[in-house]
Every structure is written in structure tokens, then in C-alpha cells.
């Protein structure tokens, strides 16, 4: 994996920085593990915008990822590493001994030809998936389940990981990259090691069109709108917002906490916020 600074042949390429990985597969993805994915442009089933700044972009197939890793005791060989347009991490195509192929999130350090295992008897090695009760305290993990059998939900992005801090009774404590310490049931599964493609955060888009390829539309400032469109809008010429920053619906931004899920608050030992 290398970081390439593009030659400034145009204003759009002058600030562009690419992450090049020559180990990635250059052919087509495995057809049996693809699914169709229609563009929603940020709209829900009523046609109303629920997520702003989305629309357009290149057509993409969804890669069906195995987040559960439930084929216990069956060795799997990494056939190839692939790019996935739907996530920041790369993915790995693994071939199990019984002939089945699946996609998984590619862990850091896993190479083509390496053998992976899942289950309580799997060795503590990068890429292997075990229940948290079988993972030693202090181990770096990723792709962590929040409910047993539901599939990995935490620490799935490029370069992310968590650390297993302690086990007490039916629950373990895991420190996430954000600093939050969370309780997780010991029957939940996690994968050893970190997520690969850790240099993803170093890339520079370079030009607006590169974001349009990804389906990201422009973000208009509130002070550039009319009063009917945003609380910051209106005024003659360029004006300040005239109030603390808020969203288009009047909710304070820049640090205002909006979490309302009291049901799972007991699972958070330490919040990621310092205050």
C-alpha cells in the first residue's frame, strides 16, 4: 500500500492524494455474492428527503458481507483482497474447506493464501473470529457484535479497532476508538486484530467531482439561504447568523447531544465525551 501525490496537471489534481494498493484484485467481484442496489438519493418510501446531500453517483453493486462468521471449525483460505465501493475498508474473498465462498472485512496484515478460522477453538490470530469469552483480556479486536448472533456492528471502518479491557460475569468491557467504554455480552463474537486499509484517512479528494462520483451532493450554508429555508437565512448582503449555530430545524449543533436511547444507556460504562 502506497500514498501517491498526483502531479499538478490541473487545479483538480493539484491537491489530490491517492492510496494505491497493488495487492487488490483487478478483475470483477464474485458474482454470487453481489446484490442490486438502487439509488435512493436520500429519500424514504414517501419520497421525502431524510438524508440531505445525497444523490447521483456511479452505479454500484452491494457486496454481501459475512458479519456473523458462524462457520465454526471449518478452515477458510483467503483467495483475494478486493475494493468495496460501499465502505472504507477493503474486503477479502475467503474459500471454506466445504467449497463455500464468502466476503469478510479484510483485517490488517491478512494476506492472500492465509488460513482463517472461526469458533471458540480458533487460535488467537489476526482475522480469526471467536466469542468474547474466549478472547484474552487486552487483545485488539474489531467487527464486534452488540447482540449474540446479530452480526458485527462496531469497529468495521478502515483502520478502526477496539480493546477488550475486562470480563465480569456475563459481560465484557470494550474500549472503542472514540474513547467510549461499552459493555458487551461475552457470547458476542469479535474478530482479532484491526481493520485494514488504515491509510484511508490520508487520502485527499482533490476536486468536487470526486465526491459527486460517490453520490455526495454539495452542502449549502444556512447563511446563504432565505429565512424560510434556514434559521440563519436572510439579511441584506453578507450577514452573520445572529444566533448560536443550529440545524435547519432549530436543533443546536457543534456539541449538542441528541442521544435519546435510554434503553441501552446501561451498556455504556464511560461516554466518549470528556464532560
UniProtKB/Swiss-Prot annotation:
Q: Which GO terms describe its cellular component?
A: large ribosomal subunit
Q: What InterPro entries does the entry give?
A: NA-bd_OB-fold (IPR012340), Rib_uL2_dom2 (IPR014722), Ribosomal_uL2 (IPR002171), Ribosomal_uL2_bac/org-type (IPR005880), Ribosomal_uL2_C (IPR022669), Ribosomal_uL2_CS (IPR022671), Ribosomal_uL2_dom3 (IPR014726), Ribosomal_uL2_RNA-bd_dom (IPR022666)
GO terms (BP aspect): cytoplasmic translation
Annotated signal sequence range: none
Cite the Gene3D superfamilies for this sequence: 2.30.30.30, Nucleic acid-binding proteins, Ribosomal protein L2, domain 3
Q: Which UniProt keywords apply?
A: Ribonucleoprotein, Ribosomal protein, RNA-binding, rRNA-binding
A Pfam family annotated for this chain is Ribosomal_L2
Q: How does it assemble?
A: Part of the 50S ribosomal subunit. Forms a bridge to the 30S subunit in the 70S ribosome.
The function of this protein is: One of the primary rRNA binding proteins. Required for association of the 30S and 50S subunits to form the 70S ribosome, for tRNA binding and peptide bond formation. It has been suggested to have peptidyltransferase activity; this is somewhat controversial. Makes several contacts with the 16S rRNA in the 70S ribosome.
HAMAP family of this UniProt entry? Answer: Ribosomal_uL2_B (MF_01320_B)
Q: What is this protein called?
A: Large ribosomal subunit protein uL2
**Protein species of origin:** Burkholderia mallei (strain ATCC 23344)
Q: What is the lineage of its organism?
A: Bacteria, Pseudomonadati, Pseudomonadota, Betaproteobacteria, Burkholderiales
Amino acid at each position: 500500500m502506497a500514498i501517491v501525490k498526483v502531479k499538478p496537471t490541473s487545479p483538480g489534481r493539484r491537491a489530490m492524494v491517492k492510496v494505491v494498493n497493488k495487492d487488490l484484485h483487478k478483475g470483477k467481484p464474485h458474482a454470487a455474492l453481489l446484490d442490486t442496489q438502487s439509488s435512493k438519493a436520500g429519500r424514504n418510501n414517501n419520497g421525502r428527503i431524510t438524508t440531505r446531500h445525497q444523490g447521483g453517483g456511479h452505479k454500484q453493486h452491494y457486496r454481501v458481507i459475512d458479519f456473523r462468521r458462524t462457520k465454526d471449525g471449518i478452515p477458510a483460505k483467503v483467495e483475494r483482497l478486493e475494493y468495496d465501493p460501499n465502505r472504507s475498508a477493503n474486503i477479502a474473498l475467503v474459500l471454506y474447506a466445504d467449497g463455500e465462498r464468502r466476503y469478510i472485512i479484510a483485517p490488517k496484515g491478512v494476506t492472500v493464501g492465509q488460513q482463517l478460522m472461526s469458533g471458540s477453538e480458533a487460535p488467537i490470530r489476526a482475522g480469526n473470529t471467536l466469542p468474547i469469552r474466549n478472547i484474552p483480556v487486552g487483545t485488539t479486536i474489531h467487527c464486534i457484535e452488540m447482540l449474540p448472533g446479530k452480526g458485527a456492528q462496531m469497529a468495521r471502518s478502515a483502520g478502526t479497532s477496539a480493546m477488550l479491557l475486562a470480563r465480569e460475569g456475563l459481560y465484557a468491557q470494550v474500549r472503542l476508538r472514540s474513547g467510549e467504554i461499552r459493555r458487551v455480552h461475552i457470547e458476542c463474537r469479535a474478530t482479532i486484530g484491526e481493520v485494514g486499509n488504515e491509510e484511508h484517512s490520508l487520502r485527499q479528494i482533490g476536486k468536487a467531482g470526486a465526491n459527486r462520483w460517490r453520490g455526495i451532493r454539495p452542502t449549502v450554508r444556512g447563511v446563504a439561504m432565505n429565512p424560510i429555508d434556514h434559521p440563519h437565512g436572510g439579511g441584506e448582503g453578507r450577514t452573520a447568523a445572529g444566533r448560536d449555530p443550529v440545524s435547519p430545524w432549530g436543533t443546536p449543533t457543534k456539541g449538542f447531544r441528541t442521544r435519546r436511547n435510554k434503553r441501552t444507556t446501561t451498556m455504556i460504562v464511560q461516554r466518549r465525551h470528556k464532560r
